Amino acid sequence: MTTMPPEMSATTAAPVGSAPSATAHHPAAVGGGMPRPASPAVGSNTTTATATTATRSRFMITDILAGAAAASAAAAAAAAALAAASSGGGRGSPTDSEREQSLVAQHHHHHQQQQQHHHHQQQQQQQQHQQAALQQYIVQQQQLLRFEREREREREREHYRERHSPPGNNPYAHHPMPPHLLAHFPPAHYAVLQQQQQQQQQQQHPHPHHLQLERERLEALHRHGHGLTGDPAQHLSHLSHLSHQQHHPHLHHPMHDERSRSPLMLQQLGGNGGNNNNNNNNSSSASNNNNNNNNSASANSNIISGNSSSSNNNNGSGNGNMLLGGPGSSISGDQASTIDDSDSDDCGGKDDDGDDSMKNGSSANGDSSSHLSLSLSKKQRKARTAFTDHQLQTLEKSFERQKYLSVQDRMELANKLELSDCQVKTWYQNRRTKWKRQTAVGLELLAEAGNYAAFQRLYGGATPYLSAWPYAAAAAAQSPHGATPSAIDIYYRQAAAAAAMQKPSLPASYRMYQSSIPPGMSLPGMPAPPPPGAAPMLSGYYAAAAAAAASAGAQQQQQQPPAASRSPATSQSANSEADCERTSSSSRQRLITPSPPLNPGSPPHRERINEEEDRERDEERDIERERERERERDEDDEEELALEV
């Protein structure tokens, strides 16, 4: 503590309320040990100074005590804060770890919530997209159904008008009547006038689906280079103007251009006898009205001329020729000029012979149901498939193994080659047609060249004379050394042989050995040999031998009676002798050379021929049944493909 001044110490030593005489009687305490002389004046001054000093000292002590208390309180607070800080420092690490753990847990929970929310949003978006796509598909189907119903109704109206209205001039064609006067006319006139009113409404309020179809059609025509009377940009701008009018009904006006009408509206305009020349009839050119006449096959509908009497070529005629492919057609201009060929990839238009089983096209006055079916069957020609070398080699190997594929084999082959089932089927159809043509041409060339040995090898079989016989299938089946050909191969070999021999009325082998038959003798059940020149396809040695045999037969017929006048026993004995001679000669030829003989020998007997004919008929019936089953399977496949499309 600080030292007190002398007067404070004196005041502290003496009581506060002490009498002044006490200080006066002790001069040493006041003077600091130095005695002073006592006088009355000095004593009074000393008493006053002592009282003032005592009062000041009391306040100073109070201040000092208050400051000391404040300092002690501050020290205590600092000590408490230090103690609190030390105790808090001891517990700091577990609090931080717990806080970190809680933060990590909160972050993980928040991340999970975000993921769940995002997944839920994705699911909702997918559901919304699916619902929107489904709604759009339903709307499109409804529009197509509505469009088809409108076309059906229009065709029914056309047929009704064609049956009940006269084909001549219609006096009410150019004069629309108010609705309250329609009841005073016959039903035919009433239908015509009602159709006119519907046309006016459709002209003023075109359907947006019709506008979209027409826009796509014009773009396709412009893209494929078809001639448009006028600038294509004007057509597209006009279509946009009409679509703008469709969205803004207050902009509609009855005197707009008719260039953007759909094929349905053009059919309605061309089929009825209505007032479809109420717009732009005063124009002197044909390009200001109905510029949809881009197809030359349907250029006779709605061409406007300057003369009002011939303002419409189809007025009152009842002939509702629809633009771009007939009344039942729904194809565009570029599709109407193309039809399917044998190399297209469609599966619905070909049978096994490469012929069209669905004939495209429709007549203007046919049945409405047939129009609809033909319009649905008519498709745009697809591009030819570009097969790779590997695909072609695999297809050729498969075709060598079997000429006809089952549905399962065809699907497996298509999956192996990464092709569609339709492409494999079309390739097989075309390849079968080519194979039949090549087989027929090859056999014809062999027959013309006289190479009957190669002809017999092509047929196959162990017995030479039976291999050349048309009924070689049963003989080859009976032969222990020859492989049994399939019924399909037998059928096509015989068909190719018939084509090579120009489809003669006699068996093919009869033409081979007819030159070796003895003169004046005929085979049982067969007519006499034809005159020289009856076998134009034989050449070289065979042609000369046939001519010599025919001339010798004619000379001997003059010397001997005809074979028909002989008795049955004589003819049978002669036949048996000829058979023995021919059998011995054929056996000698087989011993001399291993190649097939040029003269194969006699044909089988009557009983064997009958058996062969019966077996051949049975085989032909089996082949026909198999082909019918194949066609049914193809038709089922086509129906399945049509349903999938």
Swiss-Prot record:
Q: In which tissues is it expressed?
A: B-H1 and B-H2 are abundant in the eye-antenna imaginal disk. Expressed in R1 and R6 cells throughout larval stage until 30 hours after puparium formation, at which time expression is seen in the anterior and posterior primary pigment cells. Coexpressed in embryonic glial cells, neurons of the CNS and PNS, most latitudinal anterior cells of the developing notum and the central circular region of the leg and antennal imaginal disk throughout larval development.
One Pfam family this sequence matches: Homeodomain
A GO-annotated cellular component? nucleus
- Annotated segments matching region Disordered: 1-50, 86-134, 149-176, 240-259, 265-385, 553-645
Phosphoserine modifications at: 595, 602
Arranged from A to Z, the UniProt key words for this protein are: Developmental protein, DNA-binding, Homeobox, Nucleus, Phosphoprotein, Sensory transduction, Vision, Wnt signaling pathway
- Which GO terms label this protein's molecular function in UniProt? DNA-binding transcription factor activity, RNA polymerase II-specific; RNA polymerase II transcription regulatory region sequence-specific DNA binding
Compositionally biased intervals (Acidic residues): 633-645
Q: Which GO terms describe its biological process?
A: chaeta morphogenesis; compound eye photoreceptor cell differentiation; eye pigment granule organization; eye-antennal disc morphogenesis; leg disc proximal/distal pattern formation; negative regulation of transcription by RNA polymerase II; regulation of transcription by RNA polymerase II; sensory organ boundary specification
Compartments reported by the entry: Nucleus
**InterPro entries in alphabetical order:** HD (IPR001356), Homeobox_CS (IPR017970), Homeodomain-like_sf (IPR009057), Mediator/Homeobox_domain (IPR052145)
**Which residue windows does the record flag with biased composition (Pro residues)?**
594-603
Q: Give the compositionally biased regions (Low complexity).
A: 18-29, 122-134, 275-316, 362-377, 553-574
Query: Domain of life of the organism in this record?
Result: Eukaryota
Regions of biased composition (Polar residues) lie at 329-339, 583-592
Q: Which residues carry this modification: Phosphothreonine?
A: 593
Biased composition, class Gly residues, residue ranges: 317-328
**What CDD domains does UniProt report for this protein, alphabetically?**
homeodomain
Where does it mainly reside?
Answer: nucleus
User: Bias regions of kind Basic and acidic residues — which residues?
Assistant: 149-165, 618-632
- Where is the sequence biased in composition, kind Basic residues? 106-121, 244-253
Function, as annotated, reads:
B-H1 and B-H2 are regulated by members of the wg signaling pathway; wg and dpp. B-H1 and B-H2 are coexpressed and functionally required in R1 and R6 receptor cells and primary pigment cells for normal eye development. Coexpression is also required for the fate determination of external sensory organs, formation of notal microchaetae, formation of presutural macrochaetae, antennal development and for distal leg morphogenesis; segmentation and specification of tarsal segments 3-5.
The record's similarity note reads: Belongs to the Antp homeobox family.
What protein name is recorded for this chain?
Answer: Homeobox protein B-H2
Task: List the source organism.
Answer: Drosophila melanogaster
Q: What are the top taxonomic ranks of the organism?
A: Eukaryota, Metazoa, Ecdysozoa, Arthropoda, Hexapoda
Chain's gene name: B-H2
